[in-house]
């Protein structure tokens, strides 16, 4: 079976496949040590009362 030559060394195709899959998984997998991003939209209220009302409404209905 043929091997690829990289940097003057013969690399078997299955090693390249394993390296490719490992790289893709490492880049795509979620990182448990990364800081958690809170998925909450910014409340742009015109007054503190309105902001309080919006927060209470969201807590009640979501």
Curated annotation (Swiss-Prot):
- What family does the Swiss-Prot or TrEMBL record give for this protein? Belongs to the ATP19 family.
> Its gene?
ATP19
* Pfam families, per the entry: ATP19
Q: How does it assemble?
A: F-type ATP synthases have 2 components, the catalytic core F(1) and the membrane-embedded component F(0), linked together by a central stalk and a peripheral stalk. The central stalk, also called rotor shaft, is often seen as part of F(1). The peripheral stalk is seen as part of F(0). F(0) contains the membrane channel next to the rotor. F-type ATP synthases form dimers but each monomer functions independently in ATP generation.
| Topology with respect to the bilayer | Single-pass membrane protein
Task: Kindly provide the name given to this protein in its UniProt entry.
Answer: ATP synthase subunit K, mitochondrial
Q: Read off the lineage from the record.
A: Eukaryota, Fungi, Dikarya, Ascomycota, Saccharomycotina
Task: Briefly state the protein's biological role.
Answer: Mitochondrial membrane ATP synthase (F(1)F(0) ATP synthase or Complex V) produces ATP from ADP in the presence of a proton gradient across the membrane which is generated by electron transport complexes of the respiratory chain. F-type ATP synthases consist of two structural domains, F(1) - containing the extramembraneous catalytic core, and F(0) - containing the membrane proton channel, linked together by a central stalk and a peripheral stalk.
By its UniProt entry, which InterPro entries does this protein fall under? ATP19
Question: Transmembrane helix as a keyword?
Answer: yes
What keywords does the record list, in alphabetical order? ATP synthesis, CF(0), Hydrogen ion transport, Ion transport, Membrane, Mitochondrion, Mitochondrion inner membrane, Transmembrane, Transmembrane helix, Transport
Location in or out of the cell: Mitochondrion inner membrane
Q: Does the keyword Transport apply?
A: yes
Any one GO BP annotation for this protein: proton transmembrane transport
**Which GO cellular component does the record give, naming just one?**
proton-transporting ATP synthase complex
- Chief location: mitochondrion
**Membrane spanning segments where?**
14-30
The species this protein was found in: Pichia angusta
């Amino acid at each position: 079976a043929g091997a690829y030559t990289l940097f003057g060394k013969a690399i078997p195709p299955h090693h390249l496949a394993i390296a490719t899959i490992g790289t893709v998984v490492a880049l795509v997998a979620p990182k448990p040590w990364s800081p958690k991003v809170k998925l909450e939209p910014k409340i742009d209220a015109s007054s503190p009362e309105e902001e309080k009302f919006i927060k209470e409404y969201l807590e009640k209905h979501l």
